[in-house]
Amino acid sequence: MSSNLIPQVTLREAVLEDWEAIRVIEQANFSTEAAGAETLQKWIEQGQTNFLIAELNEKIAGYLVGAAVFSRHLTKEMIDNSSKWQQDSDFMTIQRLSIHPEFKGQGLGTLLLAACKEIAVARNQKGLQLVCSDELISYYEMNAFINEGISERADSHAILYELVWENPFLRRENED
């Protein structure tokens, strides 16, 4: 059996040269609310944002954008003041998890979520949080997120749900 038949998955930080491939994936999955080129470039350039790329056989297959926030639940004010997000905050919000349609169902989203969880654990953050539509709830629950109900975010016309993954390795203040 040839080794080139085994898929090679690589996770890495995004670089500016990736933005065109990212834009294609963004358009495929978020056509009505896709981020523009300037936003994608800003996300890549921002030091306080984790922008992870999943490559399958050296082709960009998906990405995850996460930013550190101070609250378990994302508010409109936090979105509007994203320049104030800091690395040493309590939670990381997942702004985008997007896989190219050609590569969906191969576990790349789960790998990106696992990498994001590792970052949160390394930073001693309390966890990850995100909002999603009802059809994605079971996917995130499969990845150990807890559905905390309908989001009170006012930046979307759709009904969105708040989901949280709590860091199981975080030492609680009242524990010995």
Task: Briefly describe each language-model feature range.
Residues Q8-I22:
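A short beta-loop-alpha structural element at the N-terminal edge
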Residues V9, K59-Y63, M92:
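Glycine-rich phosphate/pyrophosphate-binding loop shared by adenosine-nucleotide-utilizing enzymes
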Residues V15, K126, S133-D134, R153-D176:
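C-terminal "cap" of GNAT-fold acetyltransferases
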Residues F30-I60, V65-K84:
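Active-site rim helix/loop that mediates acceptor-substrate recognition in acyltransferases
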Residues L64-S98, K104, A154-I159:
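Conserved acyl-donor/pantetheine-binding loop and adjacent beta-alpha core of acyl/acetyltransferases
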Residues V69-S71, V131, E141, I146-E162:
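Conserved catalytic-core motifs of GNAT/GCN5-like acyltransferases
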Residues I99, G105-E118:
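Conserved acetyl-CoA-binding loop-helix of GNAT-fold acetyltransferases
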Residues L113, I119-C132:
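Conserved GNAT acetyl-CoA-binding A-motif
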